[in-house]
């Protein structure tokens, strides 16, 4: 049973990340790597805006702008991966400094690393996260983003924190 649930989790992860990657690549074709000019704090703010909108919609139970909430979650995934890529390459005024092939490779490597971490955490936690409410995920995302904003304010000089990537 446990193996079946984990298999289902990995299948779900793979499907969601395939959608995220498809969206990332499509937007990259449309806009190029224009996001490379974003500073880390700007990416954190973009993530915060997306998570805050999700929370607002969860509380209001209706929306006036009919954007699919799934799209907001996909945006959270892609902005998160972009933020980690920015950490690797640094932001730049010359958004064409790194080829799209390299950026795509970095994206794919991060997805692979995340998948491996998911498998390890599921082993240790026994998929307890499946019992959580979706609204709890939203709250946890917001808490993590507020922590990252504080780390940025501290200029990454943290006493005990592992840093934003964790």
Question: Where does each model-flagged region fall?
Answer:
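Intrinsically disordered, low-complexity regulatory regions
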Residues: 1-166
